[in-house]
């Protein structure tokens, strides 16, 4: 559902959009603020950026948002993982993919969707839509991931690693191993960027270069 109105500034458009997740009976609302006339070019490219908790997804997302806001729309997909039942999570992810592609369609910018989810989780999506989805995982070695998680906690609450939820840490290490061990020839195909010896700026550079190569093909 789309409701369109003119904003106070001449030429600006605000679009109130709704997406209904049939499984959850939840209506997702979001607004698009478009400067000037709406662009007609339809990009509809969706990049799914995955990686274990603590690997640096949010930091890299902020860098990309600051650098390339005219090229990418950055969205975080934490809500995809809040439900406990697999069938509900699947429906929720499909709804979020619809939202992402809708935003890309309306803004003529590619959407970069950050979510800790394996590509297999999106296999139930329509094949034509799936062709426009591109998967990449951010990984690093185990010791580096521990160091980053420890640093994250110190910044947030000045706690040492011994006080971090051990279950949370172990789950993150396991997921990082799965992402690291996945080959690019598995379906769906997934690119992998090893950030072990890279800072956030360098990691953002590699991610941007990979996405740019794909966009030039469309």
Describe the role of every protein-language-model region.
Residues 155-206, 218:
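Small-molecule kinase domains that catalyze NTP-dependent phosphoryl transfer to phosphate-bearing small molecules
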Residues 58:
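Walker A/P-loop
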Residues 49:
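Hydrophobic anchor at the beta1->P-loop junction of P-loop NTPases
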Residues 129-150:
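Conserved phosphate-donor/acceptor-positioning beta-strand/loop module used by diverse small-molecule
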Residues 92-132:
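Glycine-rich phosphate-binding loop used to anchor ATP phosphates in small-molecule kinases
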